Amino acid sequence: MTVTPERSKVLYFTPAYYYTPAAAAVHEDNTDITNLDTDLDGKRIGVCSACTYEFYLDRSLNIPGNYEFVVDNPQIQTYDTDSSAIQDLALGDGVRLDAAMSSLTTLQEAVDSGTPIKIVGAPLYYEPLAAAIDKKAPADPRPLLDEVSKTIKEMHKDGTLTELSNKWYGYDLTKKQGA
């Protein structure tokens, strides 16, 4: 789960185990959008509803790390899932969307499976993912939090998380980036 100040009011979080790179994609036929700092301004961008990608575009994103809001006045189109936005983008360049935002791994999976989209530019931000435990759990959640946190720290230290990331994604997403 993405760590946010709002969620931290009701949930305990472990140390981050993974940093999701947020990326943008366009239809494979698009030649106009090449610079994310300027070319997405005013464009129709599909994102999952109430996800960090929507919060990034409406400039309400509040997560740890350094990032800049570089898209001005986007026309945000929300979907139930990232996959639905990607499917609409795949219909054609500008048919329903000009671009879509999702995790780099989700977009890359779509590209690899033959979806007619392409990833544009570098990640816009990295969101930390951590295990979350309800602060109001019936039993004291802190011992569980401590054990899960300890395990995550050990997996970072011994390289297990890096090994899993490299195996499944082809690169290491376990280190804080863009900070």
Description of each model-found segment:
Residues 40, 89-93, 131, 148:
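Hydrophobic residues within well-ordered alpha-helices
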